[in-house]
C-alpha cells in the first residue's frame, strides 16, 4: 500500500482545531484504519487473485469468475472509504488556513492603524471594524481560532458529509460482498463451459478483518453523530450567551483593588472600618468602649462613661504618687452627642481629634517608665 504520511500530516494539523470528539475520531482513523490497513489487512489480501482457483481448465474462466465475485478488492475499497471520509476534514482544515491568513492580514492592518493613531489621527472606527471582523472569523487573542460563524458551519457540514460517506460505504459493502466470505463460490459465466466452483484462500481470516473494519466504521459513525449533537448544542449555547452578553468577546477589565485605609485610633473608642483599635492605654488601664460595629459611635451608655472616668482617675492618682505631672491637655473628656449631663460636667472639654497612625508594637518598659517622668515643656496647673 502507498505511503500514508502525507495524509497523516494533514490530518494531524486538524487536531488543534477540532473538538474532543473530533480528536477521538482522528485517533480511530489513524490507529484502527490506516495503521491496520497498511500492515495486517494488506498482507491478508495479498494473494487473493493468485490463490483463487476454479475446477476448470478453460482459459479465462478463473478471471471472469473472480471479477464477478469481487468487483473491487476489499483493500482498495477501504482505501477509497478512508479517502472519502477524510476529504470533509481536509476541507475544514482549508477553511482554518483561510481564517489564519485573514488573521495575518487583519493584524498587519491593525498595526498600521495603530502607527497612524500615534500620530494623532482618529482611527477608532477602523479598529472597531477590525475587531468585529476578528470576532466574525472566530479569531481570539494569541492567535487562537474558535469555532464561530462560518468556521462552525463548515465544521458541522464536514461532520455531516463524513457521516453520509460512512453510511454509504457500509451499504455498498453490504450490497457487494456482505460482511462474510464463503470458502466456495459458484460461477456460471462465459467463457466457462458450465457452472464451475471456485475456491477462496483463507476465508475465515478475511472474514475477521471484514467484521473488524465494520465495527470501526460503526464506531466512527457513532462518534460523528455524538460530535454533531455536541457542536449543535454548543452553537446554540454560544448564541444564547451572545444575546445575553453581546460584549462578552471583548476583554473585560479587572476590578481595581481597594486601598486599605490607614489604621487610626480615636479617643472616643471609634476605629477605622478596616483596622482594629490599637492599644493606647498604659498597663492596668481599662477603657470600656461601645460596639465598634456602630459607625456613629454614639451608643455609649452612662455606665460605660462613668467606668471610663473612674479608671482614668485611678490611673491619674497612681501616676501622681510617682511624682509625675499630667498635662491638662491630656485630660480632655469624651464628647458624647446624646449625653447632656456629661457635657455640662465637662464644660472645659474640646472636640477630640483622631490620632495619627499608631505603631502596632507594644511599648517597652523603658518607654513606659520614661513617660511618667516630668518634662520641661509640660504645663503645670
From Swiss-Prot:
In all tissues, but mostly in lens. Residues 45-76, 185-207 are extracellular. It comes from the Eukaryota. The chain crosses the membrane at residues 24-44, 77-97, 164-184, 208-228. Residues 2-23, 98-163, 229-381 are cytoplasmic. One of its GO terms (cellular component) is mitochondrion. The keyword Cell membrane applies. Residues 361-373 have a biased composition (Low complexity). Keywords: Cell junction, Cell membrane, Disulfide bond, Gap junction, Membrane, Transmembrane, Transmembrane helix. Disulfide bonds join 54-192, 187-198. One gap junction consists of a cluster of closely packed pairs of transmembrane channels, the connexons, through which materials of low MW diffuse from one cell to a neighboring cell. Plays an essential role in gap junction communication in the ventricles. Belongs to the connexin family. Alpha-type (group II) subfamily. A connexon is composed of a hexamer of connexins. Interacts with TMEM65. PANTHER family: CONNEXIN, GAP JUNCTION ALPHA-1 PROTEIN. This is Gap junction alpha-1 protein. It comes from Gallus gallus.
Amino acid at each position: 500500500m502507498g505511503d500514508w504520511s502525507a495524509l497523516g500530516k494533514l490530518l494531524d494539523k486538524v487536531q488543534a482545531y477540532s473538538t474532543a470528539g473530533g480528536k477521538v475520531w482522528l485517533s480511530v482513523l489513524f490507529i484502527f484504519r490506516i495503521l491496520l490497513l497498511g500492515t495486517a489487512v494488506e498482507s491478508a489480501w495479498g494473494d487473493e487473485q493468485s490463490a483463487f482457483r476454479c475446477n476448470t481448465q478453460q482459459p479465462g474462466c478463473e478471471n471472469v469468475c473472480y471479477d464477478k465475485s469481487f468487483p473491487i478488492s476489499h483493500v482498495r475499497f477501504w482505501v477509497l472509504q478512508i479517502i472519502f471520509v477524510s476529504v470533509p476534514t481536509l476541507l475544514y482544515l482549508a477553511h482554518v488556513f483561510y481564517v489564519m491568513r485573514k488573521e495575518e492580514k487583519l493584524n498587519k492592518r491593525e498595526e498600521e492603524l495603530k502607527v497612524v493613531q500615534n500620530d494623532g489621527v482618529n482611527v477608532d472606527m477602523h479598529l472597531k471594524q477590525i475587531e468585529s471582523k476578528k470576532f466574525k472569523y472566530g479569531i481570539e487573542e494569541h492567535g487562537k481560532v474558535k469555532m464561530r460563524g462560518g468556521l462552525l458551519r463548515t465544521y458541522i457540514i464536514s461532520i455531516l458529509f463524513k457521516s453520509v460517506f460512512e453510511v454509504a460505504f457500509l451499504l455498498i459493502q453490504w450490497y457487494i460482498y456482505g460482511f462474510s466470505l464463503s470458502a466456495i463460490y459458484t460461477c456460471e459465466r462465459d467463457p466457462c463451459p458450465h457452472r464451475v466452483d471456485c475456491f477462496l484462500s483463507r476465508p475465515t481470516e478475511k472474514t475477521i478483518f471484514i467484521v473488524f473494519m465494520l465495527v470501526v466504521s460503526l464506531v466512527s459513525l457513532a462518534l460523528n453523530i455524538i460530535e454533531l449533537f455536541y457542536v449543535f448544542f454548543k452553537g446554540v449555547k454560544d448564541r444564547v450567551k451572545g444575546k445575553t452578553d453581546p460584549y462578552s468577546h471583548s476583554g473585560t477589565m479587572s476590578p481595581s483593588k481597594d486601598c486599605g485605609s490607614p489604621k487610626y485610633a480615636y479617643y472616643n473608642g471609634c476605629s477605622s472600618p478596616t483596622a482594629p483599635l490599637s492599644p493606647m492605654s498604659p498597663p492596668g488601664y481599662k477603657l470600656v468602649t461601645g460596639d465598634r460595629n456602630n459607625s456613629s459611635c454614639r451608643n455609649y451608655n452612662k455606665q460605660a462613661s462613668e467606668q471610663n472616668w473612674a479608671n482614668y482617675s485611678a490611673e491619674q492618682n497612681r501616676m501622681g504618687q510617682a511624682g509625675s505631672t499630667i498635662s491638662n491637655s491630656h485630660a480632655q473628656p469624651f464628647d458624647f452627642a446624646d449625653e447632656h449631663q456629661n457635657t455640662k460636667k465637662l464644660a472645659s472639654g474640646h472636640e477630640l481629634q483622631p490620632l495619627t497612625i499608631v505603631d502596632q508594637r507594644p511599648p517597652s518598659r523603658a518607654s513606659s517608665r520614661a513617660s511618667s517622668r516630668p518634662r520641661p515643656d509640660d504645663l503645670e496647673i
